[in-house]
Swiss-Prot record:
Keyword Cell membrane among UniProt keywords: no
GO BP field: amino acid biosynthetic process; aromatic amino acid family biosynthetic process; chorismate biosynthetic process; shikimate metabolic process
Subunit note: Homodimer.
Binding positions for shikimate per the UniProt entry: 19-21, 66, 91, 106, 227
List of catalytic residues: 70 (proton acceptor)
Keyword NADP set for record: yes
Name of the protein: Shikimate dehydrogenase (NADP(+))
Gene symbol of the encoding locus: aroE
Length: 283
């Protein structure tokens, strides 16, 4: 039941109809007996400038930010977390004492997911793709004492921009580029593989994985940030080769849990987010 005491959080995006965040957050609120509701808000690009002022006026406590607003929302914020500023994208906004502060929980969501299965310390990691998700994850990775980062991408220019940016912001130098078609040459030297491209996403989930998988083995941990389908072709083939695989639902859940903590100061259980997500994905 919604009353005058109910606190509102939500997510802004365009489109927003297919967001999985509302069922996850609302289920956690219910299980934790918290008088909160999480609402999806459809915000078109031309109306973005009004969001922060409107949220403050309506006493909204927090907002997640999804496509296409993660970068364009930044000029309207009062403050931005150091990590989000370096990544150049915001996916979470907290409102407190009239201040709208932006955060990015995508990177930490990925890191928590990987560390559930393996340590990152001294590992050689290959990340596939050089877009926004790759930037969020790689920046966070470089603070985890890894040994080497390899960026596999079709476009060398885009990868090089990412690499230069990472080196400038972290002073981590052991970062290399490889063409996505030549990853076979380095698979044996890599411990962890992360796909951040949309290759394999529904409805094109039967296409070949972004890299060849015949050299993947039991020594590898492979994560795909795609969560629909639950198991991409990359994960299916890697599992057949003996690798430990991590589906994209893990990152989606863990970044959401971090946002929940920012909004409320409380930590929901992993299961409270996982159950409604799987229900919607499988339903």
């Amino acid at each position: 039941m919604i009353t005058g005491k109910t606190l509102i959080t939500g997510v802004i995006g365009h489109p927003i109809e297919h967001s999985f965040s509302p069922p996850m957050h609302n289920n956690a609120y219910k299980l934790m007996n918290m008088d909160y509701k999480y609402v999806p808000f459809h915000v078109e690009v031309e109306n973005l400038k009004h969001v922060i002022t409107s949220a403050k006026t309506l006493n909204i406590k927090g907002l997640n930010v999804t496509i296409p607003h993660k970068t364009t929302i930044i000029p309207y914020l009062d403050e931005i977390d150091e990590t989000a500023e370096k990544i150049g994208a915001v996916n979470t906004i907290n409102f407190k004492d009239g201040i709208a502060k932006g955060y990015n929980t995508d990177g930490i969501g990925a890191i928590v997911s990987i560390e559930k299965y393996t340590s990152l310390k001294d590992k050689n990691i290959m990340i596939i793709g050089a877009g926004g998700a790759s930037k969020a994850i790689t920046f966070t990775l470089l603070n985890k004492n890894i040994n080497q980062l390899i960026v596999a991408n079709r476009s060398k220019d885009n990868a090089q921009k990412l690499i230069t940016n990472l080196k400038n912001q972290t002073n981590f130098e052991n970062i290399d580029f490889i063409n996505i078609k030549k990853t076979d040459n380095v698979i044996d030297d890599v411990d962890i593989i992360i796909n951040t491209t949309p290759i394999g996403m529904y409805p094109k989930d039967e296409v070949a994985p972004p890299i060849k998988t015949d050299k993947i083995s039991s020594k590898h941990t492979v994560m795909d940030i795609i969560y629909n389908p639950l198991e991409t072709q990359l994960l299916k083939q890697s599992k057949k080769q003996g690798a430990t695989t991590i589906p994209g639902t893990h990152m989606l859940i863990n970044q959401g849990i971090k946002a929940f903590e920012i909004f409320t100061g409380k930590t929901p259980s992993y299961e409270s987010f996982e159950k409604p997500l799987l229900k919607h994905l499988q339903g």
